[in-house]
UniProtKB/Swiss-Prot annotation:
Its cofactor is Mg(2+). Pathway: Amino-acid biosynthesis; L-tryptophan biosynthesis; L-tryptophan from chorismate: step 2/5. This is Anthranilate phosphoribosyltransferase. It comes from Ectopseudomonas mendocina (strain ymp). SUPFAM superfamilies: Nucleoside phosphorylase/phosphoribosyltransferase catalytic domain, Nucleoside phosphorylase/phosphoribosyltransferase N-terminal domain. InterPro entries: Anthranilate_Pribosyl_Tfrase, Glycosyl_Trfase_fam3, Glycosyl_Trfase_fam3_N_dom, Glycosyl_Trfase_fam3_N_dom_sf, Nuc_phospho_transferase. The gene is trpD. One of its GO terms (biological process) is L-tryptophan biosynthetic process. It comes from the Bacteria. Mg(2+) 2 binds at D226, E227.
């Protein structure tokens, strides 16, 4: 199937099979489609709603074409979201990665610049001084020595360059928002993934089940956030032991007080970084303490997904203890320092 045939199917509100989606994605990712065709395809898929078969097909092609990162670490975990929730909250999952590392976890963080939001994970880390142009083996060394390595999506998904223009011009969430968290170049099989709609939680978990993931929590908060929220109950679809279960959690389940998100929104990466540094440091402001609580909730989920904790409650306690040692902030500075060395190596 080619993209023109696929567009005719989508206009008629007909779904594609996994194999048909793979064929179309290969056309897109190898530069055989025009920007207009790609834009129409992305919007058509969104209006129709993507099926599990379609997402599996698209993700499998992206994985196939990705530049891999080989990391010698057990229970490698990724913390990321689809983006597109429109909430403009600080970079919770990126901050959580450093808390996970401080607690002894190994994080292969996969991310990009903001597409529809104010601050993507790459924007935040760059603002902090992290060098993004790492080679695969340098990412592996970051994970092994610091506990966190960042894989800048464009460096590992070169074929994505063909869709960057249409995505940016649309400025809306598309199937690619869903694919990012499912195409970790290091092959992390343990993840916490925030999604922009509760309706996506179970389908995403089922897609990851088919793609071979081991322990994943897909989350969406009642207030619309694609993170575990401090302000509202959060719906969770958990993939564990080959089965998907669904449940709701709230901050009080972990002895954390529910609070509003006021003060946690940002307009740019620099504001996000300032809030995160306060949260991971001495928490001198009320907003810094709130941000810390939210980071702990999400880092705790990641420690549980990585099987460093036997329950969510235990994971949150481990995250709380790790954050309050100050080691998480040190991990951020360690990553900045190590990537600066790699930058010198790469640029001579």
């Amino acid at each position: 199937m080619n993209i023109k045939e696929a567009l005719n199917r989508i206009v008629a509100q007909l779904d594609l099979t996994t194999e048909e989606m793979q064929a179309v994605m290969r056309e897109i990712m190898t530069g055989q489609c025009t920007d207009a065709q790609i834009g129409a395809f992305l919007m058509g898929m969104r209006m129709k709603s993507e099926t599990i078969d379609e997402i599996v097909g698209a993700a499998s092609v992206m994985r196939e074409l990705a530049a891999p990162v080989v990391i010698d670490a057990e229970r490698l975990v990724d913390t990321c979201g689809t983006g597109g929730d429109g909430m403009n909250i600080f970079n919770v999952s990126t901050a959580a990665a450093f808390v996970v590392a401080a607690a002894g976890g190994k994080v292969a963080k996969h991310g990009n610049r903001a597409v529809s939001g104010k601050s993507g994970s790459a924007d935040l880390l760059e603002a902090a001084g992290v060098y993004l142009g790492l080679k695969p083996e340098q990412v592996a060394r970051c994970v092994e020595s610091v506990g966190v390595g960042f894989m800048f999506a464009p460096s590992h998904h070169g074929a994505m360059k063909h869709a960057i223009g249409p995505r940016r011009e649309l400025g809306l969430r598309t199937i690619f928002n869903m694919l990012g968290p499912m195409t970790n170049p290091a092959g992390a099989r343990h993840q916490v993934i925030g999604v922009f709609s509760q309706a996506l939680c179970r389908p995403m978990a089922e897609v990851l089940q088919r793609l071979g993931s081991e322990h994943v929590l897909v989350v969406h908060a009642q207030d619309g956030l694609d993170e575990i929220s401090l302000a509202a109950p959060t719906f969770v679809a958990e993939l564990k032991d080959g089965k998907v279960s669904e449940y709701r959690i709230q901050p009080e389940d972990f002895a954390i007080k529910s609070q509003s998100l006021i003060g946690l929104t940002v307009d740019n990466a620099e504001q996000s970084l300032e809030l995160i540094r306060d949260a991971l440091g001495r928490r001198k402001t009320e907003n810094g303490q709130k941000a810390a609580d939210m980071i702990v909730l999400n880092a705790g989920a990641a420690l549980y997904a990585a099987d460093h904790a036997s329950s969510l409650r235990e994971g949150v306690q481990l995250a709380h203890d790790a954050l309050h040692t100050g080691l998480a902030r040190e991990k951020l500075e360690e990553l900045v320092s190590l990537t600066a060395v790699f930058k010198q190596e790469n640029e001579g």
